[in-house]
């Protein structure tokens, strides 16, 4: 039906409804609805337009055209009707209400009221406009009157200014005459006048601007407004509001002409007038008003020449006033009174004031210069003031006065001071007397010259400044640096340096982005560092070279290059960097690179321009990068286009100081790390600590008293006496040894007969030696040394030191075999080995068999020889240690014997006479030197001359040198004389050959006729050489004797389950040994594990009793024991034919589910009527259906894709998840997992849950599998998920598959990824992944606000079978990123092998179906592993970046940058659910077909067209099953009502009790708060019904507040 109603008066029709052939017809704007009535209105207007009845109808406020002959109109409250009869038209203005329904009548009356309100508003507006026009006319008249008044005042002002100018001119002439007279007067008293004139000018220069007056006629201060001074200074112009604020007053403020822009002021004034008065722009009245206002505000302008005249005249006037004032004061001597009063006030105590006041009165009476008395009252002590008064009264007795003062002051100082302050008191007295002399002479001079008081003050200040201030400024101070160096610096230099430093700070503070400051070049501080995998940049700091850790890549040796110098150096140490995956490597600075200049640390680290000093790709020519760098959380970010090989380069600031180190680039972002705090902590803090300790020791040393020093001297004297006694005892032993050796040489034959007896008595002698050593240990330290030497020499002669007690045990006892012997024992013959290979045993299996055989052989050996496994079987190492010690003793004794005149021990000993002609021995500390000569008799005389030259006359300490000459029967022995070993040279005259052997001892052999030889041997041994000869322990590197087995055990590195890393007992645990639940501390890991399992278990609700022992795991229940249950299979049951089936394992599990669950508790509620969803049921076909996702489409290999887009996705994904950097490996016993889940096959044959398994068997299997590093495959148990699905999916047997495996495998993955997963749950507000988010408390609104953008559209996408279609290559890539984000200390080869094994078993899976079939599934992310959702989020982010780059490339023919993606897009994701916001300026249109094809062809992933939706706004989008809508200005969620309420009629599981039913209903009510009233009322009704039944049954339920459901959604 055609219907229309007129709209409000003045409204216009929408453009979409305007006729195409012309403008809108008059009267059409009164129609309520134009749909279908335009033609009707045209027809009626054409037919009745001139009729009075039609005109009456058109005078109504609202018109309703009912048909071509009838219309109804409403005016005010009357309803009239228009009709067309055969005889004409009629209009009845009232009584037509019966022709309308109540709703239509109400609607038309509302429209009429609206029109009336609009009419009233127009009338009110017209009245206001008329009143404004009248006010404007009155304002215009007032302005005219104001202009007339201003003109009159202006005339009066001009006359007044002219008169004032004339008076001012006359006043100036009078002042000039007065000034001329003053100058004449000054010439007569030149000294006084000149001094006074200088003071006047100085004073006037200071106060000129404070007392400046405007006396010029043109520049007189205005009564109202500002005074404008002509100036060309470059100052910003004032706005109209500034001029109003400054000049709209009577203060006479000054403004410069350059601040006044007349055109701008007029324009701003007119705009302000338009704003306040409400008229249109360009009103002539406003223009005139603004011109008058500006003239009023700025009435007077002055030139700079006029200001100079003002300055001169005011200065002269001020000088005259001050001069007259001073004359008055001087005439009445008021200056002296003021000075004396000031002097009296300076008295520091009553005694001094009493003594100063008489002096002041005397000085006033005698006309003494006041300044001198003031000085005397300040600098002189009270005791010398009487001499000052005497000098004032009797100035002619100065020498006598000074003499008496000198005697008095010195005597008084001597007798009144104690011994400590005597020197100070006498010095002070002498200084006082000298000051008295100088002061007396100054008073006489001032009185003779009659210098005015002002000149006296200035003269005193100038003298004090020059003598004290300048001298102090140029004085030299001594600065002692921490390294002990001293430096003398003048104070002026310090001030200059301080000013330079301040200027540098100001310069640095003015650094702004966009202006690159200049900086020094620090290329002289960098070198090239080459490691195993590449090269980088190194730089010097202090006395080391530093570079980045990834440059070295674990190399122990690196090559340093600088220009033509190349040195291979060993890495000193690796320093960990806080929150950084890289490290800092320290390399020692060699002497070849001492010329490299060190860098100094920056004083301030902030966003600024930094310089990166590096090399070009050729690593020869140096390059510099400079630009703005941002410092954030200890990292440096910039956009430098760095090259390969720039890693490790230093960042320096504008002063050339070190800020940080370059790590690398990701895309267009270069990244570095700040090193200031690290280097301060590692180096400067240690040096400061050493300096502090040194200073403490120095201070402590200064506290030693004189008595303590004397005590120390007495103790040292006692030691000297003891040393003398020891030396005498040693000399006595030497003489006894000499006699003993002679006796031994005569009885060699007897010794040969007694050898057998000595061997038999060897054990007795060793026991005797042990008792002797015990007695020696009880002796005082001073006698122990001598006794030890005696015993060792004695035993050496007897040949007993070769066997200690322990060595004897090894020699006489049975020699046992070690376990290492059995570990290398051959257990299989060649035939047995070949047979095992033919039978199909793998090399690993054969090795396992051999190891078991070797272990059994070792156990049999222990049993046969009655040896305990814990006995000390390291006898071989201990025996070697004993032999080493014995050899060391032998070497020391032989050296002592040789240096005392004997050869090394042999069967027959010879004296020097038998062996050598000359033997020189020098035994100085740290330098032992011997020279021996063997020659033929014919050259003995020549060597005798050399001997006499070698022995000098200088005396040495007793026992430090021996010189022996043995020729025939004559022997010369000279002791304790300086010996020059260089004088002994071989005599080569007549020699056929001369050969030298420069080894550890330099030997020269001269061969003569008949092969006769002369031998000269020189040997030098130092303490360093002796130290190098010591043998070290192969485990710890120490030379001291100790238990090698214990040392090896403590240094063996083993994997620690608590720390998650490999370390030894010496290194200690990296984590505190505290219980994770109660924080109790423990001494070792075993105690803590026992406590965690038995007393304070975190994983078990009911832990075992403390006395309980865990049972060993039965055979066949281990993680890899499923292979023993595998049987051959004959045919496929549920697995498709294209899937490989490995075998069959019989299991008793549900295969089909055909019946639904019936819950009796649900009879208490009314069912929700829907026919879309139901609980999942399936047949055996469902297992065949679930394999379809693995064969949807084959993905491309990543090698076929452009590496640029792959790198872009990788870089974005790493930056997105950089908060995981440095994540930790959680100990496997501390991982958190659902204990009530199935333990998988084969464990579920015995244990229903992991909780039951842990309570029975404990953690042993977890630790073993982690430690051994398995390579076998675990078995995945597959079952179908029971959930609510669409009935269409249930009919198609399209049920989701869940995979779970052995809990040991799951917790290994949890150890690597649990910490990262928990970090992702904390970052939902600022990152894409939403694991752990909540839609409540404004959660949806905050994410909607984050996604919202003015030019954005929104894409909702949901993949089909997302988990199963993830390409294996992409999944490995994601897992590699997760391993990369671990802390570097966990990235060991062992952990990498464990993680790779874990990842490969996630991809290449062996799966057991409920039908018993065991098959292989390759690819995808199993939907039951520990990190399924987190891994899916990683994949989602990576794919989204790839998708955006793909669409962007299609539109712009280039790839976007990471910054562009972050700026123009944002999204949130949860597993396979994603909501994307894209700016139209980034990607204009979202091509859904291209996206679907891209995912299928590139990745083999399934995206259905129905699962991609594009929205222009956030209203109606869905995420995680909730549709977003607005309520009270905030976004909230609406769930899928039919799906969640279907469980009230068709549940997937039974509820345990009525409380659970009530809780389920409350949860559903909470989710449906934003739904329609029908849903809310239904749930409220069910909750009330259940609550009533619970109350009748006596069950108490919680109470819920009235606003609980609504307020929980809003933030």
From Swiss-Prot:
Pfam families, per the entry: Astro_VPg, RdRP_1
RdRp catalytic domain segment(s): 1352-1486
Entry annotated with the keyword Kinase: no
InterPro entries in the cross-refs: Astro_VPg (IPR045836), DNA/RNA_pol_sf (IPR043502), Peptidase_S1_PA (IPR009003), Peptidase_S1_PA_chymotrypsin (IPR043504), Rev_trsase/Diguanyl_cyclase (IPR043128), RNA-dir_pol_C (IPR001205), RNA-dir_pol_PSvirus (IPR007094)
Site features described as Cleavage, chain residue numbers: 168-169, 508-509, 795-796, 915-916, 1027-1028
Membrane-spanning residues: 195-215, 329-348, 353-373, 375-395, 397-417, 426-446, 450-470
EC number annotated for this UniProt entry: 3.4.21.-, 2.7.7.48
Coiled coil regions, renumbered to chain: 124-187
Gene Ontology molecular function: ATP binding; RNA binding; RNA-directed RNA polymerase activity; serine-type peptidase activity
Gene Ontology cellular component list: host cell membrane; membrane
Catalytic activity: RNA(n) + a ribonucleoside 5'-triphosphate = RNA(n+1) + diphosphate
Family per similarity comment: Belongs to the astroviridae polyprotein 1AB family.
Protein name listed in UniProt: Non-structural polyprotein 1AB
Organism field: Turkey astrovirus 1
């Amino acid at each position: 039906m055609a219907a229309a109603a007129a709209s409000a008066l003045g409204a216009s029709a929408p453009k979409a409804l305007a006729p195409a052939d012309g403008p809108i017809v008059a009267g059409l704007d009164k129609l309520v609805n134009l749909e279908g009535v335009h033609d009707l209105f045209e027809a009626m207007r054409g037919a009745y337009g001139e009729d009075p009845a039609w005109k009456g109808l058109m005078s109504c406020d609202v018109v309703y055209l009912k048909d071509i002959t009838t219309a109804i109109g409403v005016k005010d409250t009357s309803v009239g009707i228009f009709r067309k009869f055969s005889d004409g038209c009629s209009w009845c203005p009232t009584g037509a209400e019966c022709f309308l329904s109540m709703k239509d009548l109400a609607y038309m009356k509302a429209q009429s009221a609206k029109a009336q309100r609009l009419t009233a508003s127009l009338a009110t507006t017209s009245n206001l406009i008329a009143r404004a026009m009248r006010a404007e006319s009155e304002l215009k008249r007032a302005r005219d009157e104001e202009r007339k008044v201003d003109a009159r005042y202006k005339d009066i002002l001009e006359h007044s200014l002219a008169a004032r100018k004339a008076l001012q001119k006359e006043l100036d002439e009078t002042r000039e005459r007065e000034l001329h007279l003053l100058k004449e007067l000054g010439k007569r008293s030149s000294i006084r006048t000149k001094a006074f004139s200088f003071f006047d000018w100085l004073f006037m220069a200071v106060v000129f601007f404070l007392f400046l007056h405007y006396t010029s006629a043109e520049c007189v201060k205005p009564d109202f407004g500002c005074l404008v001074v002509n100036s060309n200074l470059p100052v910003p112009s004032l706005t109209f509001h500034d001029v109003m604020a400054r000049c709209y007053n009577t203060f006479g403020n000054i403004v410069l002409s350059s601040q006044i822009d007349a055109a701008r002021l007029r324009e701003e004034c007119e705009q302000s007038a338009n704003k306040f008065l409400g008229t249109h722009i360009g009103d002539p009245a406003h223009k005139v008003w603004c011109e008058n206002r500006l003239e009023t505000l700025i009435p007077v302008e002055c030139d700079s020449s006029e200001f100079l005249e003002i300055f001169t005249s005011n200065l002269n006037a001020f000088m005259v006033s001050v001069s007259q004032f001073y004359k008055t004061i001087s005439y009445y001597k008021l200056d002296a009174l003021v000075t004396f009063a000031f002097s009296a006030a300076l008295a520091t105590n009553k005694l001094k004031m009493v003594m100063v006041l008489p002096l002041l009165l005397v000085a006033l009476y005698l006309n003494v210069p006041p300044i001198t008395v003031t000085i005397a009252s300040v600098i002189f002590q009270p005791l010398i003031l009487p001499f000052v008064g005497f000098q004032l009264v009797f100035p002619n007795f100065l020498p006598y006065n000074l003499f008496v003062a000198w005697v008095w002051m010195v005597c008084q100082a001597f007798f009144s001071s104690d011994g400590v302050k005597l020197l100070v008191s006498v010095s002070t007295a002498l200084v006082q007397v000298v000051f008295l002399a100088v002061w007396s002479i100054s008073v006489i001079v001032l009185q003779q010259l009659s210098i005015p008081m002002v000149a006296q003050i200035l003269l005193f200040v100038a003298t004090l400044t020059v003598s004290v201030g300048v001298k102090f400024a140029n004085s030299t101070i001594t600065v002692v640096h921490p390294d002990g160096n001293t430096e003398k610096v003048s104070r002026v230099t310090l001030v200059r340096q301080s000013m330079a430093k301040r200027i540098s700070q100001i310069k640095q503070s003015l650094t702004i982005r966009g202006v690159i400051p200049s900086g020094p070049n620090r290329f002289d501080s960098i070198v090239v560092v080459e490691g195993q995998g590449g090269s980088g940049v190194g730089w010097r700091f202090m006395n080391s070279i530093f570079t980045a850790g990834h440059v070295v890549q674990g190399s122990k040796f690196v090559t340093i290059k600088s220009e033509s110098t190349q040195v291979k150096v060993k890495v000193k140490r690796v320093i960990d960097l806080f929150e950084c995956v890289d490290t800092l490597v320290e390399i020692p600075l060699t002497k070849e690179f001492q010329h490299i200049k060190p860098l100094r640390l920056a004083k301030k680290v902030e966003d600024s321009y930094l310089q990166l000093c590096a090399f070009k790709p050729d690593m020869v020519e140096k390059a510099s990068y400079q630009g703005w760098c941002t410092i954030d959380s200890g990292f440096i970010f910039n956009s430098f286009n760095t090259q390969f090989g720039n890693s490790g380069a230093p960042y320096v600031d504008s002063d050339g100081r070190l800020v940080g180190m370059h790590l690398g680039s990701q895309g267009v972002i270069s990244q570095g790390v700040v090193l200031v705090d690290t280097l301060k902590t590692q180096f400067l803090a240690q040096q400061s600590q050493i300096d502090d300790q040194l200073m403490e020791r120095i201070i402590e040393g200064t506290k030693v008293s004189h008595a303590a020093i004397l005590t120390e001297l007495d103790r040292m004297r006692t030691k000297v006496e003891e040393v003398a006694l020891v030396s005498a005892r040693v000399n006595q032993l030497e003489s006894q040894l000499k006699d003993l050796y002679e006796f031994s040489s005569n009885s060699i034959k007897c010794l040969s007969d007694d050898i057998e007896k000595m061997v038999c008595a060897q054990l007795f002698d060793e026991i005797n030696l042990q008792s002797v050593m015990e007695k020696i240990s009880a002796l005082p330290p001073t006698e122990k040394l001598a006794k030890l030497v005696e015993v060792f020499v004695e035993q050496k002669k007897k040949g007993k030191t070769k066997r200690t007690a322990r060595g004897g045990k090894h020699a006489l006892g049975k020699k046992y075999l070690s376990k290492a012997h059995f570990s290398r024992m051959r257990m299989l013959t060649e035939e047995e080995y070949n047979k095992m290979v033919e039978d199909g045993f793998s090399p690993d299996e054969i090795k396992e068999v051999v190891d078991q055989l070797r272990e059994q052989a070792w156990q049999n050996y222990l049993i046969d020889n009655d040896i305990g496994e814990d006995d000390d079987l390291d006898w071989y190492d201990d025996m070697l240690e004993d032999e080493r010690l014995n050899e060391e003793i032998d070497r020391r004794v032989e050296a002592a014997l040789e240096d005392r005149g004997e050869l090394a021990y042999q069967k027959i000993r010879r004296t020097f006479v038998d062996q050598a002609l000359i033997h020189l021995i020098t035994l100085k500390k740290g330098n032992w030197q011997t020279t021996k000569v063997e020659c033929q008799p014919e050259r003995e005389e020549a060597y005798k001359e050399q001997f006499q030259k070698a022995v000098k006359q200088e005396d040495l300490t007793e026992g430090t040198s021996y010189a022996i000459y043995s020729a025939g029967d004559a022997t010369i022995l000279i002791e304790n004389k300086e010996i020059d070993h260089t004088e002994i040279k071989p005599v080569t005259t007549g020699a056929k050959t001369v050969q030298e052997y420069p080894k550890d001892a330099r030997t020269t052999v001269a061969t003569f006729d008949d092969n006769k030889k002369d031998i000269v041997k020189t040997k030098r041994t130092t303490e360093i050489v002796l130290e190098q000869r010591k043998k070290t322990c192969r485990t710890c590197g120490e030379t001291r004797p100790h238990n090698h087995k214990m040392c090896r055990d403590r240094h063996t590195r083993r994997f620690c389950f608590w720390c998650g890393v490999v370390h030894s007992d010496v290194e200690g645990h990296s984590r505190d040994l505290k219980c994770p639940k109660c924080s109790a501390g423990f001494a070792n890991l075993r105690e803590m594990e026992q406590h965690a399992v038995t007393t304070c278990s975190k994983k078990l609700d009911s832990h075992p009793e403390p006395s309980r022992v865990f049972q060993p795991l039965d055979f066949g229940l281990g993680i890899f024991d499923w292979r023993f249950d595998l049987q051959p299979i004959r045919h496929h049951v549920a697995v498709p034919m294209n899937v490989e089936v490995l075998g069959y394992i019989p299991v008793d599990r549900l295969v089909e589910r055909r019946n639904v669950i019936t819950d009796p508790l649900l009879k208490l509620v009314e069912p929700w009527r829907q026919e879309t969803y139901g609980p999942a049921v399936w047949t055996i076909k469902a297992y065949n259906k679930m394999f379809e996702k693995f064969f949807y489409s084959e993905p491309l290999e990543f090698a076929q894709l452009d590496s640029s887009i792959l790198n872009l996705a990788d870089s974005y994904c790493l930056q997105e998840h950089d908060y995981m950097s440095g994540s930790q490996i959680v100990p496997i016993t501390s991982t958190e997992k659902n204990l009530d889940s199935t333990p998988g096959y084969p464990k579920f044959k015995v244990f229903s849950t992991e909780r039951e398994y842990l309570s029975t068997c404990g953690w042993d299997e977890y630790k073993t599998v982690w430690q051994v590093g398995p390579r076998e495959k675990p078995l995945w148990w597959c079952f179908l998920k029971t959930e609510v699905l669409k009935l269409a999916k249930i009919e198609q047997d399209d049920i989701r598959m869940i995979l779970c495996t052995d809990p040991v495998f799951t917790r290994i993955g949890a150890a690597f990824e649990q910490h990262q997963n928990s970090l992702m749950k904390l970052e939902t507000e600022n990152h894409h992944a939403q694991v752990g988010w909540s839609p409540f408390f404004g959660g949806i609104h905050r994410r909607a606000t984050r996604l919202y953008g003015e030019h954005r559209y929104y894409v909702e996408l949901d993949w089909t079978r997302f988990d199963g279609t993830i390409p294996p290559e992409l999944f490995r890539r994601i897992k590699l990123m997760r391993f990369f984000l671990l802390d570097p200390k966990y990235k060991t080869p062992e952990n990498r092998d464990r993680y790779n094994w874990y990842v490969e078993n996630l991809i290449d899976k062996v799966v057991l179906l409920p039908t018993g079939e065991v098959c292989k599934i390759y690819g995808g992310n199993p939907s039951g592993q520990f990190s399924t959702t987190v891994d899916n989020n990683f994949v989602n982010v990576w794919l989204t970046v790839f998708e955006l780059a793909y669409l962007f490339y299609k539109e712009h023919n280039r790839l976007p940058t990471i910054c562009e993606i972050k700026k123009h897009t944002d999204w949130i994701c949860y597993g396979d659910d994603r909501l994307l916001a894209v700016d139209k300026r980034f990607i204009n249109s979202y091509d859904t077909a291209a996206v679907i094809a891209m995912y299928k062809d590139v990745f083999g992933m399934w995206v259905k067209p129905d699962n991609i939706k594009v929205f222009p706004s956030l209203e109606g989008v869905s995420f995680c099953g909730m549709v977003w809508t607005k309520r009270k200005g905030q976004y909230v969620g609406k769930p899928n009502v039919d799906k969640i309420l279907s469980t009230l009629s068709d549940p997937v599981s039974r509820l345990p009790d009525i409380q659970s039913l009530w809780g389920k209903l409350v949860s559903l009510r909470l989710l449906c708060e934003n739904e329609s009233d029908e849903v809310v009322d239904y749930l409220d009704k069910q909750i009330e019904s259940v609550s009533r039944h619970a109350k009748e049954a006596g069950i108490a339920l919680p109470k819920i507040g009235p606003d609980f459901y609504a307020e929980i959604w809003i933030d």
